[in-house]
């Protein structure tokens, strides 16, 4: 019998341990107390992310870099922090906190630096993140030894469960990212030109303000998600600060929505967070 290779699709909600959260037709014969239901809903990052159609990613301003740059003349780079908001309500849902060594950040090229980033739902402790993103230290040159981001679900008693990986093949005049599931099947990709006006000459007005990147399904090649980069007015004060709007469009699976969030953070880290 011929064995079928089934790939996880980003526009499908798959069954989880609590199927009643994602399937309105499912009836659970055992109903927990209301307190337990509320706690389960609040603490589960999938149930928070699942109904979101569009989110905003805002990089927080670090006044230490501003003081070091404009008053001391030093180009210092500190760990980034991002706020992730539901675009429809402007309410903060997640925060993303980067952790990398100070010497690595200020002495090595960004593409080579080992990186650790935690994504946690609003109100959670930094020691108990929902998602963990990891990038190893690599000696990267052009197409050799390209970096890979691994994303883990860390919400199950701090046990790491691989959700997917993000790889960035070398391209001369374009941004290329490939998103893979835990079985290393390519699910989505982005391949867009870097010759956009807002990239070549970033300014907070007119056609110089926005850059557009589109995620495509690996099989159909159709556009399934849209990432828009915005240049804020703080660009004049801190040159590497940017904001993003991520429209999930056809992506319904909360795990792949989180993968798209990780992709947006990785894109900013790799190409726009400059020393």
UniProtKB/Swiss-Prot annotation:
Signal peptide region: none
Gene Ontology biological process terms in this record: adhesion of symbiont to host cell; plasma membrane phospholipid scrambling
Subcellular location: Membrane; Cell membrane
Gene Ontology CC: plasma membrane
Keyword terms: Calcium, Cell membrane, Lipid transport, Magnesium, Membrane, Metal-binding, Transmembrane, Transmembrane helix, Transport
Pfam families per UniProt: Scramblase
Catalytic activity as recorded in UniProt: a 1,2-diacyl-sn-glycero-3-phosphoethanolamine(in) = a 1,2-diacyl-sn-glycero-3-phosphoethanolamine(out)
Cofactor: Ca(2+); Mg(2+)
Family: Belongs to the phospholipid scramblase family.
Entry function: Catalyzes calcium-induced ATP-independent rapid bidirectional and non-specific movement of phospholipids (lipid scrambling or lipid flip-flop) between the inner and outer leaflet of the plasma membrane resulting in collapse of the phospholipid asymmetry. Preferentially, mediates calcium-dependent phosphatidylethanolamine externalization. During the liver stage, plays a role in the interaction with, and thus invasion of, host hepatocytes. Dispensable for host erythrocyte invasion and asexual parasite development.
Record's protein name: Phospholipid scramblase
Organism whose genome encodes this protein: Plasmodium falciparum (isolate 3D7)
Gene name of the encoded protein: PLSCR
């Amino acid at each position: 019998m011929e064995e079928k290779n089934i790939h996880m699709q980003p526009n499908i909600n798959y069954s989880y341990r609590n199927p009643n959260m994602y399937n309105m037709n499912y009836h659970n014969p055992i109903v927990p107390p209301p307190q337990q239901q509320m706690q389960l809903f609040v603490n589960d990052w999938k149930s928070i992310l699942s109904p979101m159609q569009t989110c905003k990613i805002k990089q927080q301003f670090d006044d230490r870099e501003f003081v070091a740059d404009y008053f001391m003349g030093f180009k210092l780079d500190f760990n980034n922090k991002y706020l992730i908001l539901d675009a429809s309500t402007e309410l903060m849902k997640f925060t993303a906190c980067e952790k990398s060594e100070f010497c690595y950040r200020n002495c090595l090229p960004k593409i080579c630096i080992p990186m650790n980033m935690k994504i946690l739902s609003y109100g959670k402790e930094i020691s108990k993140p929902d998602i963990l993103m990891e990038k190893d230290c690599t000696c990267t040159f052009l197409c050799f030894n390209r970096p890979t981001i691994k994303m883990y679900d860390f919400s199950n008693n701090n046990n790491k469960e691989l959700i997917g990986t993000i790889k960035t093949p070398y391209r001369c005049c374009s941004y290329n990212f490939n998103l893979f599931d835990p079985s290393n099947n390519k699910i989505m990709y982005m391949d867009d030109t870097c010759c956009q006006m807002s990239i070549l000459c970033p300014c907070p007005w007119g056609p110089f303000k926005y850059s557009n990147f589109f995620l495509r399904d690996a099989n159909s090649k159709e556009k399934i998600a849209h990432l828009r980069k915005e240049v804020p007015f703080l660009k004049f004060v801190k040159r590497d600060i940017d904001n993003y709007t991520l429209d999930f469009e056809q992506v319904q699976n909360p795990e792949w929505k989180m993968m798209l969030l990780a992709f947006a953070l990785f894109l900013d880290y790799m190409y726009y967070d400059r020393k």
